[in-house]
């Protein structure tokens, strides 16, 4: 389900030019509108001071497509979590993650998530609808505006399964790249894996990074953690991943949330290494971030390092990603569209 109200945000320069011409305005107004939407982050047409006042007054209620910040919190590590209110009143979460040289935005692609992964707060809260491309782009503009600095990287790792909303996600990638100026190689699309969808994404020939959430080294455990895995075996998922690499020439990142005593045993690391043998890939290990809705535990440092060492011994490229924003419930797996 999508909200279908026409908005200006999400339109290309050509589309905006056509729109202003239909309004009886000269062609160059399209370029001005594009600049105010994507460079200046205009929230209403009334802000666009280069437009004639009489035209601005006529269009004062025309929807641009910007959200409003319903709630904002800052973690001790400077990560900022936002609850954004969409045009229809639904709430999504977005996270801004700053470092000295980067500003990364973790964007949502759906309101909620239907995948119901057992360790993830978003999946526990149910699913309402897909986001439109402009609602994804708006998240980046909102964070950019709040930090008063340019966003350098975007990860589709917020609420939702991006490949279920593939058309709008791909459209948003093109807008972020062509209209806002973020390089495609600075964009990451995450997925738990869906039949046919990885290959469909590959045929768009984007230069983004694909991050595949494995979270288990064998099929029975993966089905326990990710219910949708019942319809997509590890064998078929990895076959599609290999085909993705062949089509795009891009290395895949495999995400693996470490759950203490569940999927972090040395023999499971060996099993994972055997799965990925000969793969053009990198493994990101993510120590579990606790949520109230699940009883899993974060492994200790010894368990984490042992898992890393086993993978390295088997020639698997691996790193540990400690999530930012943990204290603000803004870390990986904690997004639930609520203030807690």
Swiss-Prot record:
Chain sites annotated for binding S-adenosyl-L-methionine: 160-161, 190, 213-215, 289
Entries under CDD domains matching the protein: Radical_SAM
Cofactor: [4Fe-4S] cluster
Record keyword S-adenosyl-L-methionine present: yes
Residue positions of the active site: 93 (proton acceptor), 332 (s-methylcysteine intermediate)
Domain Radical SAM core: 99-327
InterPro entries per record: Aldolase_TIM, Methyltransferase_A, RlmN_N, RNA_MTrfase_RlmN, rRNA_lsu_MTrfase_RlmN/Cfr, rSAM
EC top class named in words: transferase
Keyword Iron-sulfur recorded: yes
UniProt keyword annotations, A-Z: 4Fe-4S, Cytoplasm, Disulfide bond, Iron, Iron-sulfur, Metal-binding, Methyltransferase, rRNA processing, S-adenosyl-L-methionine, Transferase, tRNA processing
GO cellular component, one term: cytoplasm
Cofactor note: Binds 1 [4Fe-4S] cluster. The cluster is coordinated with 3 cysteines and an exchangeable S-adenosyl-L-methionine.
Bridged cysteine pairs (disulfide): 106-332
Example GO molecular function: tRNA binding
Remarks, miscellaneous: Reaction proceeds by a ping-pong mechanism involving intermediate methylation of a conserved cysteine residue.
Function (record text): Specifically methylates position 2 of adenine 2503 in 23S rRNA and position 2 of adenine 37 in tRNAs.
Record NCBIfam families: rRNA_mod_RlmN
Membership in a protein family: Belongs to the radical SAM superfamily. RlmN family.
Name of the featured protein: Probable dual-specificity RNA methyltransferase RlmN
Organism name: Rippkaea orientalis (strain PCC 8801 / RF-1)
Gene that produces this protein: rlmN
């Amino acid at each position: 389900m999508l909200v279908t109200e026409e908005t200006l945000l999400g339109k290309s320069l050509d589309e905006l030019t056509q729109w202003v011409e239909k309004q009886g305005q000269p062609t160059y107004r399209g370029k001005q509108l594009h600049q105010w939407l994507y460079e200046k982050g205009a929230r209403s047409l009334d802000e666009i001071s280069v437009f004639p006042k009489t035209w601005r007054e006529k269009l004062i209620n025309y929807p641009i497509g910007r959200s409003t910040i319903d709630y904002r919190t800052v973690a001790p590590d400077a990560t900022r979590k936002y609850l954004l209110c969409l045009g229809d009143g639904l709430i999504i979460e977005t996270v801004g993650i700053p470092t000295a040289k980067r500003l990364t935005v973790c964007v949502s692609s759906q309101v909620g998530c239907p995948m119901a992964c057992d360790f993830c707060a978003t999946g526990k809260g149910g699913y309402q609808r897909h986001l439109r491309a402009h609602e994804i782009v708006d998240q980046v503009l909102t964070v950019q505006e709040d930090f008063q600095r340019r966003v350098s990287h975007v990860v589709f790792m917020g609420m939702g399964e991006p490949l279920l909303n593939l058309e709008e996600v791909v459209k948003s990638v093109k807008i972020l790249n062509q209209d806002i100026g973020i390089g495609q190689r600075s964009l990451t699309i995450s997925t738990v894996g869906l039949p046919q969808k990885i290959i469909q994404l590959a045929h768009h020939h984007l230069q983004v990074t694909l991050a595949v959430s494995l979270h288990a080294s064998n099929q029975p455990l993966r089905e326990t953690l990710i219910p949708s895995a019942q319809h997509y075996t590890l064998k078929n998922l990895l076959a599609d991943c290999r085909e993705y690499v062949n089509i795009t020439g891009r290395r895949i990142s495999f995400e693996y949330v470490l759950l203490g005593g569940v999927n972090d045993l040395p023999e499971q690391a060996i099993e994972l290494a055997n799965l990925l043998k000969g793969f053009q890939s990198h493994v990101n290990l993510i120590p579990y971030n606790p949520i109230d809705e699940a009883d899993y535990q974060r492994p200790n440092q010894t368990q984490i390092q042992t898992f890393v060492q086993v993978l390295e011994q088997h020639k698997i490229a691996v790193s540990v990603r400690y999530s930012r924003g943990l204290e603000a419930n803004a870390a990986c797996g904690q997004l639930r569209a609520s203030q807690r």
